[in-house]
Design a protein with these regions (language model features):
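Transmembrane-helix boundary motif in ABC transporter permease subunits
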Residues: 3-9, 70-101, 114, 118, ...
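Interhelical loop and adjacent transmembrane-helix boundary motif
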Residues: 9-14, 48, 55, 213-263, ...
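Membrane-interfacial helix termini and adjacent extracytoplasmic/periplasmic loops
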Residues: 2-7, 45-53, 58, 93-94, ...
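C-terminal transmembrane helix and the adjacent membrane-cytosol boundary/short C-terminal tail
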Residues: 3-5, 16-20, 31, 35, ...
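Membrane-helix interface segments
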Residues: 89-97, 125-126, 140, 170, ...
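Periplasmic/extracellular loop-to-transmembrane helix junction in inner-membrane transport proteins
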Residues: 3-15, 36-73, 88-89, 237-243
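Hydrophobic alpha-helical transmembrane segments of multipass integral membrane proteins
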Residues: 27, 62, 66-78, 82, ...
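Transmembrane alpha-helices
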Residues: 18-24, 73, 99, 103, ...
C-alpha cells in the first residue's frame, strides 16, 4: 500500500489529463490552424498560388523571413552572451539589467514601435547621429530589423540562462587543468551544452519575428516591394475585404514557418543526441 501511495501522481489520471490537454490544444491551436487551412484551400490550390505568386506578395514574404532570420541569428549570438554575463558576473546594476530583459514581453508592441521610431527617426537622438554619418535607420529595412531584434531578444536570453546556471565552474577549471585553452573549452565543452537551449531560443525568436506587426508598422515606411512586411499585407487584404487573399498569404506564411521550425527541430534532436541529452 505504501508503494502505491508513493507511485500515485498528484495530477489526475492519464485519461482525464490527456483529455483536458487535447481539448485545450484543439481549441487554442489546432482549430484555428485548421480553419486557416480550410479557408486558404477552399478556393483551390491554383487560386492560392495565383495570389502568392504576385511580385508584391513575394517581396513581402521574402522581406519578412529574411529579416526575421537575421534578427534571430543576432539574438542567438547576443542573447547567449547577455545570458552568460547575467549569470556568471556580478556588477553594479546587474539586477536592473536582468529585469530590463523582460521589457519586450510586457511592453505593447505598438508602444515599442513608437519608442523605436522616436529614437531612430531622422530627428531622434540616435537617428540624428546616424543621419550625420549618412545612415538612415527609421523607415528603412534597418528599422524593421531593429524592431525584430527588440521583440525577440528575451526569448534567447531567458531560454539559455537556466542552462548556463547549471554548468558548474569546475567544468571549465577541469578543462583548463588538462591544458585546454579558453577557445577550446568554449567550443568543445561549453557550446555543446548550450546548443539545444540556444536553438530553442533561436526558434522562438524567429517565430516571434515572423509574426510581428505592431512595432514594425511604426518604424517601417510600409512601402510596397521595399519595406512592406507580410503581416501588414494580410491586414491590407482584410481592410479591402479580400478575405481569400489574406487567407492565401497566411497559408503561405504557415507553410514556410512550419518548414523552417521543423528543420530547426531536427537540428535540436541531432544536437541532443550528440551531447547525450536525448
Amino acid at each position: 500500500m505504501g508503494k502505491a501511495l508513493i507511485q500515485r501522481s498528484a495530477m489526475p489520471g492519464l485519461g482525464l489529463s490527456a483529455g483536458i490537454t487535447l481539448t485545450m490544444i484543439s481549441i487554442v491551436v489546432l482549430l484555428p490552424i485548421g480553419a486557416l487551412l480550410a479557408r486558404g484551400l477552399s478556393f483551390g490550390p491554383e487560386a492560392v498560388w495565383e495570389v502568392v505568386n504576385r511580385d508584391r506578395v513575394w517581396a513581402a514574404l521574402h522581406l519578412s523571413f529574411r529579416l526575421s532570420l537575421f534578427a534571430a541569428l543576432f539574438n542567438l549570438a547576443f542573447g547567449t552572451l547577455l545570458a552568460w554575463v547575467l549569470v556568471r558576473y556580478n556588477f553594479p546594476g546587474r539586477r536592473i539589467l536582468d529585469a530590463m530583459v523582460d521589457l519586450p514581453f510586457a511592453l505593447p508592441t505598438a508602444v515599442a514601435g513608437i519608442a523605436l521610431t522616436a529614437l531612430y527617426a531622422p530627428n531622434g537622438f540616435l537617428g540624428a547621429m546616424a543621419k550625420d554619418l549618412g545612415w538612415k535607420i527609421a523607415y528603412t529595412q534597418w528599422g524593421i530589423l531593429l524592431a525584430l531584434i527588440f521583440v525577440g531578444l528575451p526569448f534567447v536570453t531567458r531560454t539559455v540562462q537556466p542552462v548556463i546556471a547549471e554548468i558548474e565552474k569546475e567544468v571549465e577549471e577541469a578543462s583548463a587543468t588538462l591544458g585546454a585553452s579558453r577557445a577550446y573549452t568554449l567550443r568543445r565543452v561549453i557550446f555543446p551544452m548550450l546548443l539545444p537551449a540556444a536553438l530553442t531560443g533561436f526558434a522562438l525568436s524567429l517565430a516571434r519575428a515572423v509574426g510581428e506587426y505592431g512595432s514594425v508598422i511604426f518604424i517601417a515606411a510600409n512601402i510596397p516591394m521595399r519595406t512592406e512586411i507580410a503581416p501588414l499585407l494580410i491586414v491590407i487584404q482584410l481592410e479591402e475585404y479580400n478575405y481569400d487573399g489574406a487567407a492565401a498569404i497566411g497559408l503561405a506564411m504557415l507553410v514556410i514557418s512550419f518548414a523552417v521550425l521543423f528543420l530547426i527541430n531536427l537540428i535540436q534532436i541531432w544536437s541532443r543526441r550528440r551531447t547525450g541529452n536525448v
